[in-house]
C-alpha cells in the first residue's frame, strides 16, 4: 500500500464524520460477510457511514457510495501472559454468581484465553493509500485534529452489536411484591433463633422458608430431579393464604431470597428488615449459610448430566470442518435460532434463493445493508455453506491448541441477522430463550413478507389442510381448507408401551417422597409413533356446534386431513402441554420416529358422492340492545357455522360464554379471552388456553378484538381516520395492491404491524375479491399491472418421506434449556451444537422436538 499524503487526506476531509450518540457503528462485523477485525484482511469501517466491510466487500461500498476514507482495524491474537499467582496464562474463570448473561457476576460468554494486539490505520480508496494512527503528528493541526477526533470516537464508541448485547438477559430482575407494604403479621409471634432451624413438618434442615405472616418454618419445593424439599411451605400457603416467605440461610444485611406464593415468583421486599424484626431477627447481624435460589439454578444450568443423551456427551465425537459444517456461536440463549437456520440452509430451495443468488442480492442491497432482510439472510447462508468460517480455533503463539479447542471452531456470530429478524418483536428482540417452533414460524413469516413477487423457498413446507365438520343431527357436512407449515402431532400418553413400568416408577417415586429418600431412576414413557399418527387423524367431537341446517346448536365431529403433501414435512411433537392446574409442563416421552414415513392414508378426499353440505347461512346476530353478559360482539371469522365470513353490521354472534368465563376466572383479561375463543373457533377451553399461553407476550394481547369491517372500540368509524400514506406505501412495496393495503389498515385501526399480519391471514379472501373485480369488467392486464397475488402456492406429490433432520430440546420448558440439531449429510448424521459440529454416533431420534422429513422421489 502507498503512503497517504497530506493532499489526499485533505481531499476527503469533508466526508469524515465524528460518530454521535445515535449513530450505529458497525466495527465488529462486515455487513456482507462474517469477517471481523481478527480476519486475515481485517475490517474497514467507513468514516462517513460507520459501516464495516471485509477486504472482499469494501470496494463494493466505495463503488456504490463514493465514500473513500476508511478506518482499517486489524487484530491478532496472542496467548495471555502467565498469571503470577497461578503460573498459567489461563487463570481460573470466575464462578458465576448471578443467573444472567453479559452482566456483572453472570455468565461471561466473551471471556477468552488470549489477548489481542490492535493495528489501526486510515486508508483511502481506490488506491489504498494509508497512514498509521500514530503517524498523524506531522499533519497540519486542522487536519490532524479532525481525523484524530473521528478515529478516537470510532474506537471508543460502543459498536452496534455491543449495543444490542446491552439488552443483557438477566434472570434475576425482580419486582417489588404487591404485599410488601401491606403484609399482615400475626401478634405474639415465636422468636426465631439465628440458627439450628428445622422444618416443623419433617426433618429437613436445609431449603427452609420462614413465612413472614405467622413465622412457620417449612421446607421448600421438591425439584424435578428429586432434590429440594417436601413442598411443606407451599402447602402451608394453600391452607392459609399467607403469601410471603424468606429463605433462611440467605439473610444478610444486603437482603435475602423472598418468594411470593400469590405472585408465583421471587420478589423484592423493601420492608424485609421490619418484617424480620417482628420475629426477633436482626437482619444486620445475619450471615449467609445456604445457597440462594439463583445459585441453585446456576448449578442446575451448569450440570449437563441429564442432557448427555441428546448432546451425545458420553461418546467421543469426530469434529467436522468445511462447507456445510460451520458452527454458530451462541449469542446468549440463541441456540433456538442456531438450530433452525442450520436445518433451513440444508434445504436446496433456501440455498438457491439466497446463496446461489448472493451476488445479485448484494448488488441490489440498499446503502445500509445491515437493515436489509435478503442481504442478511444471504450473508448467513453463505457463512454456513462456504466453509470460510469452518476451521479449527487458531493455534496459540506457541503452536499448540488446547485439547477442548480441537473440536470447536470459531464459526459465525449472526448478530446482524438476529437483531434484524427480532426487530420490533416482543420476544425475539430479547436475549431470552425462545421456542424453536415459534421462531421457525416467525422466520417463515419474514421470508413470506419479503418474497411476495419472487421465488419463495417457503413453498417446500407449505401445505393445505382439509377440515371436515359433520353435524351429527343432520349428517350434513362442511369442508374447509387452510394453509399450514407444521404438522402438530399429539402424544397419546395412554398408548405407552411400558405402562406397567411407568406405574411401578410412579409408586416408587411416591414412596421415596414419603420416606424422604432419593428418587428412583427415571422411567420414560415409550409411545409408538403409529399411535401419535392415529391420534392426529382421529375424529374430534365439537360440542355446542352451531348447525346452519338446524339453525340451532348441535354436536359435530371434526376430522383433519392433508389436501396436499409438501416437499418437506415438518412435524412438531406436542411435548409441551398444560396440567390440570394450567401450569405448563413437558412430557418426558420417547417416540421412535421412523426413518421412512408414509402418510398417504391421511390424504383428504373432499366432498364425496352422497354427502350434503351444510347451508351457507349466517347464524343469528346479537343486537346492541340484547343482553350480552360478558361476551360483547365477537364471533368466529373462519367457520360459517359460527358467523358469516363478511361483516357489514357492527354486531357479530356470541362466543362460548362458559369458556370465556372460565378463562377470565383464571385471571386473564376479558378482551384476551374473547380473542382466544374467537381465533380458536369455539373449539373449547383447552384450545383457547393454548392460544392464550402462546400469545401472552403479544403487545396487543389485552387489546379489544377488532373484526374486519368493524370499527375499533370507542371509534366512530374506521374511515374517520384515513390510513397514513407511508403505511400504505410500505405494504404496497411488499407486493400487495393499494386497495389491499387500504383494506388491511382500515381493518386494524391503521396499525402497520397488525395490518401486515391481517393481510397474510386473509390472503384467500383478498384473492377471491381480486378475481371478482376482474369478472366484473376489469381487464386481466390491469390486474397484472397492480401485481394482484394469485394465492398461496403449494406443491403436491406422494406422501412418502425420509427423515433428514431433527431439532431436540433439553430442559423442562421452552423458555429455558438448550437446543441442538441433527442433520443427515453425505450419508451420515451430523450434530450441530452451537460451535461444535461433529459426526453423530448415536443420534437420539426418539427424543426430538421438531422433525424434518424430505419427500422420497417415486
Swiss-Prot record:
Q: Altering residue 202 to A: what's the impact? A: Decreased rate of activity
Q: Does the keyword Nucleus apply?
A: yes
Q: Which domain of life is it from?
A: Eukaryota
Q: Where are the zinc fingers (UBP-type)?
A: 175-283
Positions of post-translational N-acetylalanine modification: 2
Describe, as the record does, how this protein assembles with itself and its partners.
Answer: Homodimer. Interacts with TRIML1.
Functional description taken from the UniProt entry: Deubiquitinating enzyme that participates in a wide range of cellular processes by specifically cleaving isopeptide bonds between ubiquitin and substrate proteins or ubiquitin itself. Affects thereby important cellular signaling pathways such as NF-kappa-B, Wnt/beta-catenin, and cytokine production by regulating ubiquitin-dependent protein degradation. Participates in the activation of the Wnt signaling pathway by promoting FOXM1 deubiquitination and stabilization that induces the recruitment of beta-catenin to Wnt target gene promoter.
The name this protein carries in UniProt is Ubiquitin carboxyl-terminal hydrolase 5
Organism this protein belongs to: Homo sapiens
Q: Which gene encodes it?
A: USP5
Amino acid at each position: 500500500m502507498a503512503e497517504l499524503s497530506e493532499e489526499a487526506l485533505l481531499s476527503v476531509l469533508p466526508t469524515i464524520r465524528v460518530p454521535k450518540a445515535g449513530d450505529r457503528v458497525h466495527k465488529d462485523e462486515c455487513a456482507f460477510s462474517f469477517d471481523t477485525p481478527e480476519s486475515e484482511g481485517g475490517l474497514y469501517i467507513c468514516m462517513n457511514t460507520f459501516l464495516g466491510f471485509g477486504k472482499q466487500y469494501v470496494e463494493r461500498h466505495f463503488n456504490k457510495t463514493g465514500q473513500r476514507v476508511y478506518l482499517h482495524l486489524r487484530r491478532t491474537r496472542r496467548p495471555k501472559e502467565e498469571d503470577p499467582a497461578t503460573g498459567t496464562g489461563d487463570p481460573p474463570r470466575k464462578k458465576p454468581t448471578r443467573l444472567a448473561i453479559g452482566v456483572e457476576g453472570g455468565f461471561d460468554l466473551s471471556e477468552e484465553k488470549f489477548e489481542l494486539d490492535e493495528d489501526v490505520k486510515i486508508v483511502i480508496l481506490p488506491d489504498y493509500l494509508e497512514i498509521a494512527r500514530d503517524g498523524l503528528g506531522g499533519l497540519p493541526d486542522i487536519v490532524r485534529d479532525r481525523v484524530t477526533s473521528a478515529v478516537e470516537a470510532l474506537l471508543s464508541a460502543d459498536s452496534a452489536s455491543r449495543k444490542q448485547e446491552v439488552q443483557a438477559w438477566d434472570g434475576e430482575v425482580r419486582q417489588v411484591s404487591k404485599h410488601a407494604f401491606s403484609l399482615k403479621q400475626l401478634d405474639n409471634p415465636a422468636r426465631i433463633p439465628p440458627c439450628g432451624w428445622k422444618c416443623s413438618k419433617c426433618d429437613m434442615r436445609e431449603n427452609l422458608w420462614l413465612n413472614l405472616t405467622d413465622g412457620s418454618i417449612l421446607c421448600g419445593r421438591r425439584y424435578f430431579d428429586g432434590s429440594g424439599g417436601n413442598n411443606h411451605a407451599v402447602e402451608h400457603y394453600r391452607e392459609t393464604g399467607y403469601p410471603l416467605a424468606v429463605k433462611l440461610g440467605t439473610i444478610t444485611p444486603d437482603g435475602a431470597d423472598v418468594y411470593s406464593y400469590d405472585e408465583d415468583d421471587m420478589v423484592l421486599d423493601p420492608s424485609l428488615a421490619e418484617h424480620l424484626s417482628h420475629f426477633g431477627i436482626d437482619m444486620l447481624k445475619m450471615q449467609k449459610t445456604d445457597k440462594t435460589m439463583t445459585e441453585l439454578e446456576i448449578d442446575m444450568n451448569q450440570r449437563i448430566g441429564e442432557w448427555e443423551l441428546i448432546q451425545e456427551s458420553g461418546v467421543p465425537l469426530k469434529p467436522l470442518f468445511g462447507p456445510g459444517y460451520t458452527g454458530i456461536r451462541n449469542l446468549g440463549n440463541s441456540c433456538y435460532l442456531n438450530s433452525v437456520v442450520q436445518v433451513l440452509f440444508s434445504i436446496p430451495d433456501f440455498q438457491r434463493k439466497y446463496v446461489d443468488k448472493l451476488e445479485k442480492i448484494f448488488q441490489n442491497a440498499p446503502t445500509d445493508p445491515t437493515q436489509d432482510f435478503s442481504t442478511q439472510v444471504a450473508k448467513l447462508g453463505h457463512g454456513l455453506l462456504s466453509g470460510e468460517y469452518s476451521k479449527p480455533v487458531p493455534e496459540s503463539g506457541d503452536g499448540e491448541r488446547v485439547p477442548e479447542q480441537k473440536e470447536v471452531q470459531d464459526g459465525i456470530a449472526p448478530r446482524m441477522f438476529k437483531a434484524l429478524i427480532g426487530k420490533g418483536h416482543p420476544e425475539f428482540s430479547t436475549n431470552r430463550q425462545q421456542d424453536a417452533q415459534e421462531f421457525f414460524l416467525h422466520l417463515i413469516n419474514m421470508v413470506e413478507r419479503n418474497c411476495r413477487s419472487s421465488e419463495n423457498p417457503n413453498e417446500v413446507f407449505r401445505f393445505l389442510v382439509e377440515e371436515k365438520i359433520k353435524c351429527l343431527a343432520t349428517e350434513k357436512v362442511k369442508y374447509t381448507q387452510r394453509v399450514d407449515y407444521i404438522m402438530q402431532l399429539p402424544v397419546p400418553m395412554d398408548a405407552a408401551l411400558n405402562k406397567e413400568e411407568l406405574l411401578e416408577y410412579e409408586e416408587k417415586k411416591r414412596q421415596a417422597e414419603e420416606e424422604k429418600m432419593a428418587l428412583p431412576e427415571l422411567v420414560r414413557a415409550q409411545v409408538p409413533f403409529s399411535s401419535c399418527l392415529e391420534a392426529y387423524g382421529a375424529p374430534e367431537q365439537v360440542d355446542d356446534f352451531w348447525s346452519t341446517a338446524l339453525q340451532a346448536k348441535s354436536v359435530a365431529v371434526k376430522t383433519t386431513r392433508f389436501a396436499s403433501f409438501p416437499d418437506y414435512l415438518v412435524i412438531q411433537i406436542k411435548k409441551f402441554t398444560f396440567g390440570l392446574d394450567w401450569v405448563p409442563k413437558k412430557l418426558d416421552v420417547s417416540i421412535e420416529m421412523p426413518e421412512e414415513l408414509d402418510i398417504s392414508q391421511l390424504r383428504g378426499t373432499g366432498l364425496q358422492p352422497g354427502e350434503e353440505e351444510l347451508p351457507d347461512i349466517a347464524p343469528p346476530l346479537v343486537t346492541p340492545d340484547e343482553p350480552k353478559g360478558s361476551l360483547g360482539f365477537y364471533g368466529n371469522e373462519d367457520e360459517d357455522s359460527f358467523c358469516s365470513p363478511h361483516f357489514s353490521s357492527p354486531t357479530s354472534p356470541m362466543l362460548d360464554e362458559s369458556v370465556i368465563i372460565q378463562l377470565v376466572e383464571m385471571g386473564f383479561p376479558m378482551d384476551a379471552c374473547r380473542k382466544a375463543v374467537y381465533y380458536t373457533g369455539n373449539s373449547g377451553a383447552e384450545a383457547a388456553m393454548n392460544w392464550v399461553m402462546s400469545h401472552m407476550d403479544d403487545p396487543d394481547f389485552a387489546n379489544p378484538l377488532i373484526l374486519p369491517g368493524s370499527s375499533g372500540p370507542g371509534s366512530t368509524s374506521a374511515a374517520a381516520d384515513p390510513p397514513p400514506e407511508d403505511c400504505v406505501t410500505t405494504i404496497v412495496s411488499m407486493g400487495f395492491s393499494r386497495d389491499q393495503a387500504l383494506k388491511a389498515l382500515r381493518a386494524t385501526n391503521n396499525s402497520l404491524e397488525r395490518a401486515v399480519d391481517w393481510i397474510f391471514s386473509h390472503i384467500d379472501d383478498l384473492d377471491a375479491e381480486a378475481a371478482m373485480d376482474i369478472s366484473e369488467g376489469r381487464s386481466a392486464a390491469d390486474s397484472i399491472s397492480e401485481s394482484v397475488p394469485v394465492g398461496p402456492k403449494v406443491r403436491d406429490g406422494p406422501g412418502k418421506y425420509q427423515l433428514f433432520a431433527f431439532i431436540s430440546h433439553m430442559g423442562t420448558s421452552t423458555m429455558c434449556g438448550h437446543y441442538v440439531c441433527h442433520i443427515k449429510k453425505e450419508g451420515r448424521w451430523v450434530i450441530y451444537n452451537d460451535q461444535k459440529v461433529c459426526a453423530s454416533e448415536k443420534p437420539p431420534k426418539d427424543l426430538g422436538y421438531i422433525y424434518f422429513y424430505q419427500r422420497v422421489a417415486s
